[in-house]
Curated annotation (Swiss-Prot):
UniProt name for this protein: Small ribosomal subunit protein eS1
Gene Ontology molecular functions: structural constituent of ribosome
InterPro entries from the UniProt entry: Ribosomal_eS1, Ribosomal_eS1_euk
Native organism taxonomy: Eukaryota, Discoba, Euglenozoa, Kinetoplastea, Metakinetoplastina
Main location: cytoplasm
Subcellular location: Cytoplasm
Ranges where the record places region Disordered: 1-24
Keyword annotations of the record: Cytoplasm, Ribonucleoprotein, Ribosomal protein
GO biological process, one term: translation
Subunit note: Component of the small ribosomal subunit. Mature ribosomes consist of a small (40S) and a large (60S) subunit. The 40S subunit contains about 33 different proteins and 1 molecule of RNA (18S). The 60S subunit contains about 49 different proteins and 3 molecules of RNA (25S, 5.8S and 5S).
Biased composition (Basic residues): 1-19
Family named by the database record: Belongs to the eukaryotic ribosomal protein eS1 family.
Pfam families, per database record: Ribosomal_S3Ae
GO cellular component: cytosolic small ribosomal subunit
Amino acid sequence: MALGKNKRISKGGKRGKRGKAQETMARKEWYDVVAPSNFEKRQFSKTICNKTQGTRIAADVLRGRVFEANLADLNQSAGEEEAYRKVRFTVQEVQGRNLLTQFHSMEMTTDKMASLLRKWCTTMETTVEVRTADGYTMRLFVVAFTKPQANQQSRNCYAKQRLVKWLRMRVTKMIKRRLSKVQIKEAVSLLTRNVLSDALVRRCNPIVPLREMRIRKVRVVRTPKFDAQALLNAHGTIPTSVEADPREVEEAVEAAPAAAKAAE
């Protein structure tokens, strides 16, 4: 019979004693995510991160995180009409408990894009890549839909190919002319407040009647070398971190004994 080690009767010593279990949330810290100053609501989100321990620095972990917010929540004066657009920000710098972000991308929701599609019309799409004055390269995706002309008898409203090419050329020229002269902060304001899209509609309607013309997606594909002073200028006055109000706990009132109730 071969002799083997019986795990049930062997008494091996422990290699090391386990330390006292520490609560998970005790090792973490909360940070406020701050949007640039061209948005009305600056602190739009909170995030959590492990505290700095040894060579693992919390600021290095937080840089590069991307956060998404609804445009109607960021610009509350615009109302619910802007709720179909999602804006993303990327963290570039950590200042105390505030995360200073910069514009990352913007796009329409899927249900809004699906509601614009119709039959018997031409869908025109174009992509424009433009470089801002401070070195950011943005890629814009524009979509447009035709509509019937006045007193038209035909059911469809298809556009001729030469008009589609003409419209794409005008959209490309206008976007490059408007955005190449401004910095990223002004470019985002032109996009989020519909200044650029309204100008495109006014200039392109004489070419072909348009039912809708939207900038459905914007992406920052290339960024310049990080400049801390430029980021601080984009944020302006940074709001202080607002902590949650402490919860008030009412004192419990002891119930009277049963004997005392009976005596009463």
